[in-house]
Amino acid sequence: MKTFVAKPETVKRDWYVVDATGKTLGRLATELASRLRGKHKAEYTPHVDTGDYIIVINADKVAVTGRKETDKVYYWHTGYVGGIKQATFKEMIARRPEAVIEIAVKGMLPKGPLGRAMFRKLKVYAGSQHEHAAQQPQVLDI
């Protein structure tokens, strides 16, 4: 019996919508990363993108435990000398709530071209509206 290897052109990808209201950030991100990789499928192949498309709504209502709301700090650099910037979790939720989930999930995906392809299948929206109704996404309860 030969080992099954998924081919990129034969992979069937589904669309799912996840409501992030009240969900813990890390626990949500691990499940999203696993599904973006396709690890929940029987035909999972490490070097082939077998994951599904995932739409996350209500990203502004995601929760963190403990004092992370004020203690967790996000850093980025503008590219200019002395251009290091920082913001707490609370400030990031107010400024760009989508980025909080995107950063958490991106860190859990492989680094390189395959990981970037997997990350492109994640669509995050701050509110409850999304623009992917034509894909008829199924509700995924995490």
UniProtKB/Swiss-Prot annotation:
Q: Which GO terms describe its biological process?
A: negative regulation of translation; translation
Question: Which UniProt keywords are present, listed alphabetically?
Answer: Ribonucleoprotein, Ribosomal protein
The record's annotation in Gene3D superfamilies points to:
Ribosomal protein L13 (3.90.1180.10)
Molecular function terms, GO-annotated? mRNA binding; structural constituent of ribosome
Record Pfam families: Ribosomal_L13 (PF00572)
Q: Does the keyword Ribosomal protein apply?
A: yes
Show the GO cellular component annotation of the record. cytosolic large ribosomal subunit
Q: How does it assemble?
A: Part of the 50S ribosomal subunit.
Which family is this protein grouped under?
Belongs to the universal ribosomal protein uL13 family.
- NCBIfam families documented for this protein: rplM_bact (TIGR01066)
Q: What does this protein do?
A: This protein is one of the early assembly proteins of the 50S ribosomal subunit, although it is not seen to bind rRNA by itself. It is important during the early stages of 50S assembly.
This chain belongs to the protein called Large ribosomal subunit protein uL13
The source organism is Mannheimia succiniciproducens (strain KCTC 0769BP / MBEL55E)
The major lineage groups are:
Bacteria, Pseudomonadati, Pseudomonadota, Gammaproteobacteria, Pasteurellales
Q: Which gene encodes it?
A: rplM
